[in-house]
A protein has these predicted regions:
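Short, flexible turn/loop "capping" segments at secondary-structure junctions
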Residues: 66-68, 136, 179-181
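Short alpha-helical transmembrane interface motifs in multi-pass membrane proteins
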Residues: 79-80, 166-170
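Mobile beta-alpha loop/short-helix "lid" or hinge segments that flank ligand
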Residues: 61-66, 159-161, 176-177
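Short linear motifs at protein or domain termini
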Residues: 1-103, 211-234
Length: 234
């Protein structure tokens, strides 16, 4: 876990502690089901325990940690039912903005998106799944920005703690990693041809694919999930 640069303002310290812990949970550096110590995190981050406790309270509201009196704080396990609901939000918003995105997308924008895909390929070659996730986010975020729907992206980015951790798990697998890059290449061809129907279908499949692979993930990482029985509900 990275350390924090000391700040002069208490609010800056609080925000940085919250951000670092949240990023480590999202990246599975703090694995689902892991018990986390306020004292140990405070020491690692070189801060007092107060901002760590405050961060835990905020993260509990986001369903990323569970705080149990007398027992401590645990990183929330991945809830597949919640992940499916988060997927629905993303799919609904992202498919809705496609007409505006295609309308506003220019040749320089296309070049920018293609460059992001090239960087994603480099991540695949270098086996850097977390860097790929960041580039994947940038790729899809540009859809929203070019559509003039930045707020919708903020909604997607702030309401996907369980779905996002599924994404991180899926790209640990080389075949899935490569498949995600190839889907982006297909999307780019559809964007260039302004084929909105094909793009909508491909994007829908792209977003749902992670949920579709839940059974494999349950077998590989059973301790990361709230209950192994949840796959029967989806």
């Amino acid at each position: 876990m990275p350390s924090l640069t000391p700040k002069t303002q208490d609010n800056s310290i609080r925000e940085n502690v919250y951000r670092v812990i949240k990023e480590n949970i999202a990246a599975l550096q703090l694995a689902p089901g892991t018990t986390v110590s306020t004292q140990e995190l405070a020491a690692k981050l070189q801060v007092s325990r107060t901002p760590v406790r405050e961060a835990f309270i905020r993260l509990q509201k986001e369903d990323l940690v569970e705080i149990t009196p007398q027992k401590g704080t645990m990183v929330s396990r991945i809830d597949l039912t919640r992940a499916e609901k988060e997927r629905f939000i993303r799919e609904s918003l992202e498919t809705a903005i496609l007409p505006l995105f295609l309308q506003n997308c220019t040749e320089p924008d296309l070049k920018e998106l293609e460059l992001l895909i090239e960087k994603q390929k480099a991540c695949f070659t270098g086996l850097k799944p977390l860097e790929f996730i960041a580039l994947d986010n940038q790729f899809h975020q540009r859809f929203f920005e070019l559509a003039g729907q930045d707020l919708s992206w903020d909604v997607v980015a702030s309401t996907n703690p369980h779905y996002n951790r599924l994404r991180v798990l899926t790209v640990q697998n080389a075949a899935t990693f490569d498949g995600a890059v190839r889907q982006h290449e297909v999307m780019m061809d559809q964007i260039r041809h302004r084929d909105i129907d094909a793009l909508r279908r491909e994007l829908t499949d792209h977003v749902r694919k992670i949920i579709a692979e839940k059974n494999v993930l349950l077998q590989l990482y059973p301790d990361y999930f709230a209950t192994a029985q949840q796959e029967m509900k989806l």
